[in-house]
A protein has these predicted regions:
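Charge-dense, helix-prone N-terminal extensions
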Residues: 1-110
Length: 110
């Protein structure tokens, strides 16, 4: 993980670790935070990746500081990459985490 990703992990963890169903797993070359066995959020190249409803993909992509999530050369619908400028405050970071947790909790547990 890059130093930026390690710093983001340290910022994410307090907002998610006390929630029921929380776990961590190495993924995407870094660390992802899981809820009930489903990938939820994590750092990636200094940005925050969040799992959201695929049906709202286009709407999410139009938000400020949001880029398509593309690890393999193909856009991953249902995921958003939030640039560092979009999570400068803890309130902004928590809001993205809360959105991802709400969505992921709607999925069947793994």
């Amino acid at each position: 993980m890059t130093p930026e990703d390690e710093e983001l992990v340290a910022r994410i963890r307090p907002f998610i670790q006390r929630r029921k169903g929380y776990s961590e797993q190495k993924m995407f070359g870094g660390l992802c935070f899981m809820m009930n066995g489903n990938t939820c959020v994590g750092p990636w190249k200094g940005s925050l990746i969040v799992r959201l409803d695929k049906a709202r993909h286009e709407e999410t992509q139009s938000e400020a500081f949001v880029l398509p999530m593309d690890i393999t050369g193909k856009v991953m619908k249902g995921w958003a990459r939030v640039e560092p400028e979009g999570i400068t405050s803890d309130d902004d970071l928590k809001a993205w985490i809360d959105r991802a947790v709400r969505y992921v909790r709607s999925l069947p547990a793994k």
